[in-house]
């Protein structure tokens, strides 16, 4: 696990209460392990962080997209707070290197588990909020999400349509979507879909196949614009 100082530099924020930072990065698996005395993990902070993130992103969109109606703002917000975007922010922070987890969780692939990265990212937002104030948290979120907010000129329409139009304009075959994984119980499944256009491919997850396809298309569009 890397030094928290590196993470604080990436955030441009130094925690006054380091215990909050540790709690935000503590995986729930620690509670079942006898070597760890503290029963705190990131689950409660993740709950708060989800709400803080939604509030801040909503305010940013309301302020910066004055000509967009409620429906378009909701579509953009949905993209900015979806698992894929949150995990891309977590990847920018190399957050997987800082999550504190049991050896068993790590061996099982816990550092690359998107749920863990998403939850820790949201918990980190809550920890910053509790350690500082809403204004500081707002500035940090706006900085971390800046590149994704700029992309939002393309989200007036469905990302699957946008990807199809890109493929046609580039003389490629139409995108092909393939379900590659289904996890969880039938009433709370998570689907993973792979989308492929020529030699480009990307995955997306969602609670429905349709949502997973949209998220895969969004991720691939984001990649294409940065290549």
UniProtKB/Swiss-Prot annotation:
Its EC number is 3.1.26.3. Transmembrane segments: none annotated. Its main location: cytoplasm. It catalyses: Endonucleolytic cleavage to 5'-phosphomonoester. GO terms for molecular function: double-stranded RNA binding; metal ion binding; ribonuclease III activity; rRNA binding. Its cofactor is Mg(2+). One of its GO terms (cellular component) is cytoplasm. Residues 158-226 form the DRBM domain. Keywords: Cytoplasm, Endonuclease, Hydrolase, Magnesium, Metal-binding, mRNA processing, Nuclease, RNA-binding, rRNA processing, rRNA-binding, tRNA processing. It is found in: Cytoplasm. CDD domains: DSRM_RNAse_III_family (cd10845), RIBOc (cd00593). PROSITE patterns: DS_RBD, RNASE_3_1, RNASE_3_2. Residues 4-133 form the RNase III domain. Mg(2+) binds at residues 46, 119, 122. The active site is at 50, 122. SUPFAM superfamilies: dsRNA-binding domain-like, RNase III domain-like. Homodimer. PANTHER family: RIBONUCLEASE 3, RIBONUCLEASE III. Belongs to the ribonuclease III family. Digests double-stranded RNA. Involved in the processing of primary rRNA transcript to yield the immediate precursors to the large and small rRNAs (23S and 16S). Processes some mRNAs, and tRNAs when they are encoded in the rRNA operon. Processes pre-crRNA and tracrRNA of type II CRISPR loci if present in the organism. This is Ribonuclease 3. The lineage of its organism: Bacteria, Pseudomonadati, Pseudomonadota, Alphaproteobacteria, Rickettsiales. The gene is rnc.
